[in-house]
Amino acid sequence: MDLLNSGLRGSGPWALLAPSPRIIALLARRAGRMNPTMALVETSAGYPPVEEKKPFEEPPAVVVTPSDPWPRPYYLDNGLRRVAPYHFTYNTYCKQRWRGREILDIFSSEFRDRPIEYYKDAMERGAIAVNGKPVESISKIIKNGDVISHTLHRHEPPVTALPISIVHEDEDIIVINKPSGVPVHPAGRYNYNSVVEIMRAERGHGWNPLPCNRLDRLTSGIMFIGKHAKAAEALSLQISGRTVRKEYIARVKGKFPDGEVVCDMPILQISPKLGLNRVRANGKAARTVFKRLAYYPPEQAHDNPEQTELDKTRPPMAKEGYSIVRCLPVTGRTHQLRVHLQFLGHPIGNDPIYCNQRVWGTRLGANDSDATQDTDEDIITRLSRMGKSEVADAVAYHDEMVDEYNKKKAEKMSGELCEVCQTPLYTDPGEQELSLWLHSLRYEDAGGSWSYVSPLPAWALPPDGMDGPTEVGGMEELVEAVKEDNPEIA
């Protein structure tokens, strides 16, 4: 215990990387002793001091950190919140599809973010273990019940340095305005750079934030965080009960029609792995109400003799300017707003999936409910081929954005290696990897007992030299369009 405590405080020479209690118990039973052997990782002598609720101003002076470093090793740089690399141990049981396969084959095919040479080296130096013991051969066969451990030097992607601002707080809940590009929960390459962990770092290691609603990583806006389980459960049930109105703001391509537009097209998930959904007759029922808030024409006329070559290659909708659209989702299907806007011919302008000409062609999937333009297999194949060096033409109507994005995406890997683990390092994310022009603007109880609204994001405000709305009125006109069929939100 003294060893563990001193390691976690960073004041001792070693820190433990412990498996979960369930895995500890399993390994202990197999080994016939109270505790399994755990990996010891050397760590530096400490962390720089940090003010309460304030991230590091400079990178922490650590190269190797414990698996649960505290304070979290955040620092701010170039408008981004970064996490200093740290050692982390993943533990997993053998999955059914892994049974009878060689361990190197499993890692090289299932975890393709690193080359096969890395996994060979990791096995040779004992960073990959099975049932608490180093792998003696890269040809080791994995069987049912095996526990596989992988200790690695973890590099998290940076996220925006914008703060998680508080809209409302009481003894039960916190209402936040989530920045775009920050995932809610730890997932994939993101761990400490998540809403849950950032808020924990600000309020204390023992504090457990409980998200009550869901927002995609790229979506910004209103989120509810429960302070205790009872409050989180009650609010989650209220939201799922469809008596809570939600309003989003989107920036879409072209001039969106006047008046209220109701889209009732069903949505089908055609690729869970890629997170891809399409309008399909055999999909789940979905309904959204849209209303244009503002339209901003392009800065450059179509017949301008000073058009650049890039201007001439832009799709027609891109040359028609863009609209700011209010969105009221009556149902809550995955990617519902993005899919419905695409179907209506006005996809979100920087959507990396549904406004991507390399995937959907120049029509971008508009009014294609029967897959007459492209089959699902065609779309899945094209989306799967989008590699690290490719750029989505979805953003090709802003010269400055395209130039910067091409520079970022053309060299996804920086060409540099980590001095500790020799992992290839990524360049910083471009603007399109940090934001989506979709914002959760408002949540309110249909009975009128509460309502929370966030400010309009910068991309929804009038551009320089143009007039337009800077705030949004009530939801009555949106609700009016569907209240007969959906009285629960009236």
What is the meaning of each model-derived region?
Residues D2-A490:
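RNA pseudouridine synthases
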